[in-house]
């Protein structure tokens, strides 16, 4: 509900929903509710970042970090789940601090992100792409995108918005490196895939 309202630009309603839901879940010892609370912290943090409400996003991010620490103490919750939660959060915090031009703090959180196993998987590498792009580390952006594209190709899953998002990140990185030919080639691929998606949707 909160996410739908936010996407429909009913932002006051969206944040009210997030806050009420978080209050209901806060303090729960039930495993699913604890996991759900972490999810809602993450969703609200992302929306606050998109709305340039950076101080509030940081506050929510730190609350999520505390919640992940609580999840770590639950025996039924796997280490991999907790690792992934930390990985995603630390990549976001690195990006926020880079936006705020607090580069040393950003790098500290990037290193925390790299300390997690998830950060070295194709999926996890994509978490850091916004930070790497903002900090001008374009080669790493391209490397991370390449690995994720290979994963999607092996799954024969390239006709979707997620794949297009990865390609757009590559375009930005190549433009940042002034490699205009490579950027143009990927833009052609984006157009081809977009046409294929539109054709498929029409046929369905």
Task: Locate the predicted segments by residue.
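Helix-start (N-cap) detector for alpha-helical repeat units in TPR-like alpha-solenoids
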Residues: 87, 121-122
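Amphipathic alpha-helical segments of tetratricopeptide repeats
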Residues: 19-29, 62-76, 107-116, 146-154, ...
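Hydrophobic positions within repeat-based interaction scaffolds
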Residues: 12-15, 55-58, 72, 81-84, ...
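Solenoidal tandem-repeat scaffolds enriched in leucines and small polar residues
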Residues: 5-14, 18-74, 85
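Residue signature of alpha-solenoid helical repeat architecture, marking inter-repeat boundaries
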Residues: 32-35, 77-84, 119, 161
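"A position-specific structural signal for the A-helix of alpha-solenoid helical repeats
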Residues: 7, 36, 42-43, 85, ...
């Amino acid at each position: 509900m909160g996410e739908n309202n936010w996407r429909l630009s009913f932002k006051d309603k969206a944040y009210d929903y997030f806050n009420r839901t978080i209050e209901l879940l806060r303090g729960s010892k039930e495993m699913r509710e604890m996991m759900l609370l972490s999810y809602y912290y993450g969703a609200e943090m992302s929306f606050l970042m998109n709305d340039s409400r950076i101080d509030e996003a940081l506050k929510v991010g730190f609350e999520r970090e505390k919640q992940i620490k609580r999840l770590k103490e639950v025996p039924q919750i796997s280490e991999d789940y907790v690792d992934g939660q930390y990985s995603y959060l630390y990549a976001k915090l690195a990006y926020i601090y880079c936006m705020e031009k607090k580069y040393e703090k950003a790098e500290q959180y990037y290193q925390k992100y790299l300390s997690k196993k998830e950060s070295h998987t194709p999926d996890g590498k994509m978490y850091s792409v916004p930070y790497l792009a903002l900090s001008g580390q374009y080669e790493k952006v391209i490397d991370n995108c390449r690995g994720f594209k290979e994963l999607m190709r092996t799954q024969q899953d390239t006709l979707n918005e997620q794949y297009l998002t990865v390609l757009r990140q590559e375009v930005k990185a190549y433009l940042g490196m002034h490699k205009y030919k490579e950027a143009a080639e990927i833009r052609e691929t984006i157009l081809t895939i977009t046409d294929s998606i539109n054709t498929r949707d029409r046929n369905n």
